[in-house]
Amino acid sequence: MDKRIERRAFLKGSALALGSVAVGDWGGARAAAATSEDKSQVFFTRDISGDGLLRIYSKINAGMTGKVAIKLHTGEPHGPNILPREMVKALQQHIPNSNLVETNTLYKAKRYTTADHRETLKTNGWDFCPVDIMDEDGAVMIPVKGGKHFQEISVGKHMLDYDSMVVLTHFKGHLMGGFGGSLKNIGIGCADGANGKKMVHAAPDDDNYASWLKGEPFMENMVESAKATIDHFGNRIVYINVLRNMSVDCDCAGVSAAPVKARDLGILASTDILAVDQASIDMVYKLPETELHDLQERIESRKGLRQLSYMKEMKMGNDQYELITV
């Protein structure tokens, strides 16, 4: 039987668990009163396995039709924290007419060129189905509706070949974004390596990463980029966050990722991108201080919570949700 809890009650429990951990400037902690009709549904399971993933996907898959892209961060070579291959394989084989999709990177590493990227895919075990590197044949511009930074954004050309998208995300920290949830997975991950990622990062034509855009302006760029993908798919896009092996570093870091200090929490899923990322943050912020500290420092020092508040401003979803355990 589904077990339901509204966000206000969840956050009350979170505050008790946090104790003395400071969250004073965390906008997400302000839960307004609302009726259940005002809330988005977020589904949760503690079962981080193929079975758990299939069970939670069944709660959100009503809009999935036609050719389905499974957007996954496939990681740098030998990354210790990437999602388990067998779990991802179980989902992909369950979804008809589906395959994994990725894009090349802006930074010069083992996923910078399509040839190197394909070798990395083999190294990391992503060989149980086709993996479409969406910018292999170039990019296209798609509109950003209501953006204040962009009117359009460059994405991998092959994205237009798909009818639906499942955003399957390893939720964790991120060097520049503070945290990497569903928003980051498509805001950066669907932008092509040659142009779109450069637009989001406001990166000059050099390898001086220190000069790339940071803080709230970067979060806003990332949100607007993601909005373009969401608007493109309409009601045929869903979001799954796996809260497992949550290093402060993204899977971009590969073997250099910082050690994991936080426990695994489970899988969250929704048809609402803001709700699923908000619920993920709320759940992480409920961790004991010893497990939360490094993640919280990474998130807040990078102004990562601006991802959530700007998604709300852009009317991309609801930060009030009903958490349903399945």
Where are these regions (language model features)?
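Signal peptide processing junction and immediate N-terminal pro/mature segment
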Residues: 28-33
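Hydrophobic membrane-targeting alpha-helices
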Residues: 22-27
